[in-house]
């Protein structure tokens, strides 16, 4: 299972989600079925990355802003609007390190 431990992991995971969301995540034969990547898990891990990038209390509003973008993107993926969802993920990527 993918582990989010650093900002570099976040960058890599954004690209991974952009490439495979919503339902094309590669099957990993060394993982159990419940540990395979899904859309929900991918976005959970993106949120973990937000916390890694902005752990300080002073950045609570930045975390909220970024999580709202992720919420919109996830909802668009769930509703089958993959192009708009991808645009929102690109927006997230562009905003993640703008202070």
Where are these regions (language model features)?
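Detector for methionine-enriched segments
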Residues: 1-4, 37, 51, 76
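Amphipathic alpha-helical binding modules
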Residues: 67-99
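Residue-level recognition of alpha-helical structural elements
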Residues: 3, 35, 58-62, 78-85
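Short terminal alpha-helical segments
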Residues: 1-35, 93-95
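Amphipathic alpha-helical interaction modules
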Residues: 18-64
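Residue-level signal for functionally critical sites in structured catalytic/ligand-binding pockets
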Residues: 14, 52, 74
């Amino acid at each position: 299972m993918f582990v989010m431990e650093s900002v570099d992991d976040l960058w890599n995971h954004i690209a991974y989600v952009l490439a495979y969301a919503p339902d094309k995540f590669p099957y990993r034969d060394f993982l159990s079925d419940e540990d395979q990547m899904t859309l929900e898990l991918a976005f959970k891990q993106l949120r973990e990355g937000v916390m890694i990038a902005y752990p300080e209390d002073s950045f609570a509003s930045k975390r909220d802003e970024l999580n709202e973008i992720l919420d919109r993107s996830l909802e668009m993926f769930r509703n089958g609007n993959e192009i708009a969802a991808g645009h929102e993920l690109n927006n997230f990527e562009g905003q993640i390190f703008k202070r």
